[in-house]
Amino acid sequence: MDEDNLETALQTYRAQLQQVELALGAGLDASEQADLRQLQGDLKELIELTEASLLSVRKSKLLSTVDQEHQEDAEYLAFQKAIAEEAPVDPGNDSKTVPGSEVQPTPTSSALEEEEEDPDLEDLSGAKVNAPYYSAWGTLEYHNAMVVGAEEAEDGSACVRVLYLYPTHKSLKPCPFFLEGKCRFKENCRFSHGQLVSVDELRPFQDPDLSLLQTGSACLAKHQDGLWHPARITDVDNGYYTVKFDSLLLKEAVVEGDSILPPLRTEATDSSDSDTGDASDSSYARVVEANTVDTGTCSSAFAGWEVHTRGIGSKLLVKMGYEFGKGLGRHAEGRVEPIHAVVLPRGKSLDQCAEILQKKTKQGQTGASRPPRCRRRSSRPEGRPPPRNVFDFLNEKLQSQVPGTPDAGVDTPERRNKDMYHASKSAKQALSLQLFQTEEKIERTQRDIRGIQEALTRNTGRHGMATAHLQEKLEGAQRQLGQLRAQEADLQRKQRKADTHRKMTEF
């Protein structure tokens, strides 16, 4: 990448880092904060690498400039020496010899042609055009811009400096101090001082067609920061548009017709063939592809895990030019399927992990072919049946002979109640332990419900997705609390029955 692309990428990364830091200060859940902090660290590392690359490019450019100057001086001395050897020396004209430092090359025909073309380029100053913009992720986008003035590129080609009228990034937003001639940062400014564009790449200016905008359509809307952000129209009323920005950090706004325009990118349903074949849509973004790439089919839903999050990862990918269904990378040659995480046992070697996975696979295969076994009666905490007498034996035998009665081996609610009625001391202790654990779970669930309610109160009216997520968690916690209450009542009933039997049998 050249110096301009590296500077643009650096500004984009810094803007993304600022958005992540703003999101961290919004008071999110612990899991979302962990993801954002990891993303923050990755962006900082990426910024450091980009700065190092930019410094290396500038250093190499400076060294090449110095070497070129030395080479030109050597060629100029050799040229003077060749002229001195070929031209005859006139003794009478020695005093009229022109010094070497005053010798100037005669202008060539190409230089004269460029001087003749300069007035035509100066006429473009102040004109509105459709100028290209190469983003940091390798896409070519055409934006409406205004020509500031004519300049000459390093290779001598005719170029103009343009300022973009609808900036979507800080790197495209015109610097207000540069327009007044007071900017102190010059090339290091994070705002735009204009971009050099070849005259051959300019296209005619196209006014935005607001008739394409309607309720539910995507658009670009101007925010208070002066940038145009992607949004979606929710309502249209007498020339006023109510838009909802795609970014969760931006609130819903009402704008007029001069602060809204159709999106620069075509919809995802449009094919690349229609993009290249339709000349009327030339103002939209064009993705530069060196060749046709077979992206393959994705058998799994891309970013399916983001139903549990705010989807910051896929939104950053879309901002960097990624199109769903295509592979990663500049030419869409990367992987399509997401990487599935495999959690291995902690503290085990790779051989032991492989052996454990093989055992699990074999168990799954054998378990699928083995018929399900009948569940036994619930084992008692003491591991032995309750004491029985001769009357219990006779009752079981007589009831088993009566038609319509349950079998002796079937575990019925009456039998469970009777077993609990004759429960031993260890069974009562286990019952008390279960009741204590259930009460602890109820207290913990109540604390969770209070915490969720406080978070829901804080986020009401601020973050719609966060509020819905918290409401869902609150409903689940309340359902769990109801189940625990029912379990507690059942355990208390069993405990009272056991206490009643103890009081009636002790004299």
From Swiss-Prot:
This is Zinc finger CCCH-type with G patch domain-containing protein. One of its GO terms (molecular function) is zinc ion binding. Residues 487-507 have a biased composition (Basic and acidic residues). The modification N-acetylmethionine is found at residue 1. The modification Phosphoserine is found at residues 272, 349. Residues 88-125, 264-283, 359-389, 486-507 are annotated as: Disordered. Residues 94-111 have a biased composition (Polar residues). CDD domains: Tudor_ZGPAT. Keywords: Acetylation, DNA-binding, Metal-binding, Nucleus, Phosphoprotein, Repressor, Transcription, Transcription regulation, Zinc, Zinc-finger. InterPro entries: G_patch_dom (IPR000467), Znf-CCCH_4 (IPR041367), Znf_CCCH (IPR000571), Znf_CCCH_sf (IPR036855). The keyword Zinc applies. Residues 309-355 form the G-patch domain. GO terms for biological process: negative regulation of DNA-templated transcription; negative regulation of epidermal growth factor-activated receptor activity; negative regulation of transcription by RNA polymerase II. Residues 112-123 have a biased composition (Acidic residues). PANTHER family: ZINC FINGER CCCH-TYPE WITH G PATCH DOMAIN-CONTAINING PROTEIN. It comes from the Eukaryota. The modification Phosphothreonine is found at residue 276.
